[in-house]
């Protein structure tokens, strides 16, 4: 629900920029605040509706709102030459590789998207999965669906820099930098 609310705000901002550019005075910082608010709402909706039978119907890869810029770029009001879009969150996109803790909101958002779909899959198919025999597993559509989800999860993890991965990097390192909670979220997903 929060995602739909912020999506309406972004739509109004986009319409205003498109139809009345001389009257739209949002700075880059204000625009980025809207973007970050949108993705925080998306993550919150994922967290609150985890495992719900009918999770909200937004497909992550089809969302046209750009992903947040790094914390450093945001803090220093630097506009990167190009922005990551949700559809770019794969191993084929150079911008998506080696994401550090400064891209934590992007990492968490994508992680929650995958987590919700895995949890929904497990909830909806737990009886069928429990009754699968080893002979069924080679051709089962359920197993194929699980493999696709697992591949997405593995790809998501591979896009992260080693400094974001526990236990390769200690929690204390990120706590010292003020990123302890974010580091924990990423590694709990």
Residue ranges and their predicted role:
Residues 1-102, 122-137, 154-178:
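Acidic, Ser/Thr-rich, low-complexity intrinsically disordered regions in fungal proteins
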Residues 102-123:
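Long, repeat-rich segments with strong aromatic
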Residues 110, 117, 148, 152-155, ...:
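Charged, amphipathic alpha-helical oligomerization/scaffolding segments
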Residues 30, 100, 104-107, 142, ...:
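Aromatic-acidic/polar surface patches that form glycan- and anion
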Residues 182-189:
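C-terminal substrate/ligand-recognition segments
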